[in-house]
Amino acid sequence: MKFLPQRHAIASFGEGGFRFGDMSHQGHLLVLPSGMRAWDGIDFSGFIAEKDEIDFVVIGTGASLKRMGLGTLEAQGLYADVMTTSAAVHSFNLMLGEARRVAAGFLAVGA
């Protein structure tokens, strides 16, 4: 997936990918106000480019909680809630359903 110019709730995840909006994506996923795209799991420039449209950042670190270097985001005034991908997907879907200005980065689970 290069770019999907909409945000969708995540319908399911696992086996190394995500399902949303009658589509699927294999690999890590970045969800920004402008849309959804593949993510390498370490580049936070997409969040920074759209920071004026983001109130909440959720990062899913895979099947287990991992530390991530978020200094780049924090230097731009963005603070991320880091949790497992399962918890992050649930949090993202809830906030998206409430029409909150949320962005997310999800590391894939179970390749």
Model-derived regions, located:
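C-terminal structural segments of small proteins and small subunits
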Residues: 79-107
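Mid-chain, well-packed structural core segment of small domains
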Residues: 51-85
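Non-catalytic interface/targeting segments
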Residues: 1-45, 97-111
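Short glycine-/small-residue-rich flexible loop motifs, especially phosphate/cofactor-binding loops
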Residues: 15, 70-72, 92
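Short active-site-adjacent helix-start/loop capping segments
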Residues: 38-40, 65-69, 90-91
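Short amphipathic alpha-helix with an adjacent loop that forms part of the alpha/beta core around
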Residues: 45-51
